[in-house]
A protein has these predicted regions:
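N-terminal signal-anchor transmembrane alpha helix of single-pass membrane proteins
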Residues: 1-36
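Charged, low-complexity intrinsically disordered regions
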Residues: 32-69, 73-174
Length: 174
């Protein structure tokens, strides 16, 4: 009688383990489906291209040109951290149509105020001669409204920096 109980216990543990794994994979698939939908909606609203992620740990990315002027990319990926786990990182990059010389001279008080506003939302905002970006933000955004808001903030900042004769409010187009 003891062998049957042992056998039934082993089979029960194996079945429960299998069901648990399938349930976790199912939850991961549902989460990926919702995230793909949110990123697709944000990309459509911004006029960017997005290819849905099909793998469980795939890299999310949307990119394109806004108003024929600014090249815009948003991407997220998972990387190992120092504690042996993984961290998800969000990156935003808006590139100017052409390289600006000495962009620091273009930072008027109005632009500095906008830079502070953007930095309060995105953190780690960097303005260079060829782009405005926020690279390495920890966490992952799954809501389309927040993705759109963050990209629009960077676009607004980039529009303020570009000399006026180069842009006719491309922000109005989106």
């Amino acid at each position: 009688m003891g062998d049957e109980v042992w056998y039934a216990t082993i089979v029960g543990v194996i079945v429960l383990s299998g069901l648990s794994i399938f349930y976790i994979l199912y939850l991961a698939k549902m989460r990926r489906t919702k995230t793909n939908a949110a990123w697709k909606q944000a990309a459509t609203e911004l006029g960017l291209d997005f290819t849905p992620v099909t793998r469980i740990f795939g890299k999310y990315r949307m990119s394109g040109v806004i108003g024929k002027q600014l090249s815009c990319s948003v991407w997220a990926y998972t990387k190992p951290n120092s504690q042996g786990g993984y961290t998800t990182v969000m990156n935003y990059d808006v590139r100017f149509p052409q390289r600006l010389n000495n962009v620091k001279e273009l930072l008027t008080p109005n632009i500095q105020s906008k830079l502070l506003e953007v930095n309060n939302v995105l953190k780690k905002v960097v303005v260079s001669d060829d782009s405005v970006n926020s690279i390495g933000m920890h966490g992952f955004i799954r809501e389309s409204e927040i993705l759109v808001q963050n990209v629009k903030l960077l676009i607004q900042l980039a529009e303020l920096i570009i000399p006026n004769e180069e842009v006719d409010s491309i922000f109005e187009e989106i």
